């Protein structure tokens, strides 16, 4: 959509909000995190539907927590959401010089070794609140193509697509499988996540924190068709910056068993979540689709 069409009065309130957020992203780093935590507190109070979803998810995934512990984790999660929003916008808008000292990459040699095979790399990730800034740190070292879900709001989609195209080299709608395969054929690193519940004929149910979760098998299928290596990729917020984690390429993947592959990927995500549970995107209805005979948990 042309930018001129996004300047009409219907978008003015959103433009105002974007202007405020632009200002917050240019605060010193510590102030920015503090502002993000406050945004999270406000969101916790106002977004009661998402708060309820996150609370249910935490109850399902961490049954050993008592009510007080779970509510404390829930509040920390919303703080992480607020910080994640400003981190995402910082990743879109700020120059490398403002960010590069904050990112510490662990395992870059695994990505380089996988790219040296010449058949492309699937950077398998998940929806953690520091996802965008983690990808930004990685783009300082290599070109990335990122699969994403287009936003329904045209103005947000404009900024999302424009920013990701400029920082990540190329943003690809998650349903554009042929375009993803072309990227892999060019030996590019393609970021892809399978941890959100979207109805899809290629989803299977696989264990996630002891519960069956509908899991997209696209990573397995892309790897099978292209011969690409699959390198797990996660980002964790620390006290003084961020740790970007690149693990060794998965052996014997895909295995030929989509359900077993989905379980393996879910276990990788679960292990990372347990390191910093507040930093995962709990406001998503991860357990929305249920196996036949099970009731809706939400």
Regions found by a protein language model. Name each.
Residues 2-125, 159-162, 166-168:
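Membrane-anchoring hydrophobic helices of lipid-metabolizing enzymes
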Residues 3-8, 39, 43-46, 65, ...:
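Non-catalytic C-terminal accessory region of glycerolipid acyltransferases
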Residues 13, 47, 127, 153, ...:
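Charged, low-complexity surface patches
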Residues 19, 53, 109, 133, ...:
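Short Gly/charged-rich anion-binding patches and loops
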Residues 117-175, 197-203, 207, 211:
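Catalytic core of membrane glycerolipid acyltransferases/transacylases, capturing the structured
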